[in-house]
Amino acid sequence: MSAKIKVDEISSIIKERIENFELNINIEETGKVVNVADGVASVYGLKNVMANEMVEFENGVKGLALNLEENSVGVVILGSISGIVEGTSVKRLGKLLRVPVGDALIGRVVNALGEPIDAKGPIEYSETRFVEEKAKGIMARKSVHEPLQTGLKAIDALVPIGRGQRELIIGDRQTGKTTVAVDTIINQKGQDVICIYVAIGQKQSTVAQVVKKLEEYGAMDYTIVVSAGASEPAALQYLAPYAGCTMGEYFRDNSRHALIIYDDLSKHAVAYREMSLILRRPPGREAYPGDVFYLHSRLLERASKLSDELGAGSLTALPIIETQAGDVSAYIPTNVISITDGQIFLESGLFNSGIRPAINVGLSVSRVGGSAQIKAIKKVSGTLRLDLAQYRELQAFAQFASDLDESSRKQLDRGQRMVEILKQPPYSPLPVENQIVIIFAGSRGFLDDIPVSAIGKFENELYSFIEAKYPNIFEDIRTKKTIEKDLEENLAKALNDFKMTFSVK
């Protein structure tokens, strides 16, 4: 007996199969390399590619579409150009460049793409973010009101920095710009601030030295180092600051505080100029392309102090600019000065005369940091800037005048001691309470009878003396953050007691 065919059952199975059928066709738009030179490839055939879209070469190297022309696309190569020749096929990836973010990066040295370069194994990250993010709007921000202590007396007293500020460090080569930045990172220990140090166009040996110093002082426990060395393609040097900024924004957006240092944006502008000229973009002043201002403004505007509704996190930026022979009126320095909230100007003349950090107090300014400065340091350093300016004027006058009146001589002597107080050896940031004590001693005349050569010894021994005999002074300054009459009297008593025991020899 022949089996009866169940027509209804078969037709329902066929219908179900048709309904569940998925046609997986992966359509890829590809093009060919027309020519390649200096890390930039000209690609024909990618008709629908978008600006800043990622592309991939047949050998797996990624690229970034920067120039969209009528018949070709200018692609900067994010890696080695070996193996990329005329005729190499390129495919669109349909996405923008992203980098890993999060706590997994802390303590690591990565390149501009967030890949580890410190031989400590892969990074187990759980989140990535776009390298190019839009800066927060006005309503998402809050005015800068919390201090970010650098540990340097000259900065914390005269050019204070607040969390969420952009403060430029500017000066000639070999004037201690990186040292100021590294000191600031070291001083964030225990302050719950994540630091990101972005090295752009630096020698690998220089970056290794910085990392070694940070490890030596235990600062790598809260620091990420992003390095795009001098030997790396201009495209990676161009991307490094944006990648570092994205990593910092992750902490800011999660109600935490971050500090980012761009060392330095002069080399960043040079890398962008190199890329732009190879892409045949029209050059402008000093051969930089027309959008070089936007290059830095869109980066530095991302630093901010967020409103309470968004978690009150902050990202503070300390960009570094290298000048030529102290010329701050060049194109890139003036651009960055106009973008930032103030600048710390380092002078080679001061550096060579032994005043280190070599900060020119007259030219350095902080436009918003004053509202973030704690009351105690504001009180003791209130007239310090004016006193130093008058001292410099008198000093210039004293070179020509042989006899000075008593008040001028006193002013000169006091000024000399204040300059000596503001000197600080590298990699030894001071807690703010120690800074307040020594500036109080100098500005109130307690050091007038101490020889200038003995000021350093006096300062070091004073901290130990107060710690041992008057520990409540440091504690009161730390907790109250202001100097009231009783604390002022107690501090004056401590200074007088110490002077009785202090020996110059």
Curated annotation (Swiss-Prot):
Binding site for ATP: 171-178
HAMAP family recorded: ATP_synth_alpha_bact
Keyword field contains ATP-binding: yes
Catalysed reactions, as listed in the record: ATP + H2O + 4 H(+)(in) = ADP + phosphate + 5 H(+)(out)
Pfam families per the UniProt record, alphabetical: ATP-synt_ab (PF00006), ATP-synt_ab_C (PF00306), ATP-synt_ab_N (PF02874)
Quaternary data: F-type ATPases have 2 components, CF(1) - the catalytic core - and CF(0) - the membrane proton channel. CF(1) has five subunits: alpha(3), beta(3), gamma(1), delta(1), epsilon(1). CF(0) has three main subunits: a(1), b(2) and c(9-12). The alpha and beta chains form an alternating ring which encloses part of the gamma chain. CF(1) is attached to CF(0) by a central stalk formed by the gamma and epsilon chains, while a peripheral stalk is formed by the delta and b chains.
Localization annotation: Cell inner membrane
Site feature location: Required for activity: 364
Keywords: ATP synthesis, ATP-binding, Cell inner membrane, Cell membrane, CF(1), Hydrogen ion transport, Ion transport, Membrane, Nucleotide-binding, Translocase, Transport
EC assignment: 7.1.2.2
Highest taxon in the source lineage: Bacteria
Function: Produces ATP from ADP in the presence of a proton gradient across the membrane. The alpha chain is a regulatory subunit.
Family assignment from sequence similarity: Belongs to the ATPase alpha/beta chains family.
Annotated membrane topology: Peripheral membrane protein
Gene Ontology molecular function terms on file: ADP binding; ATP binding; proton-transporting ATP synthase activity, rotational mechanism
Protein name: ATP synthase subunit alpha
GO CC aspect terms: plasma membrane; proton-transporting ATP synthase complex
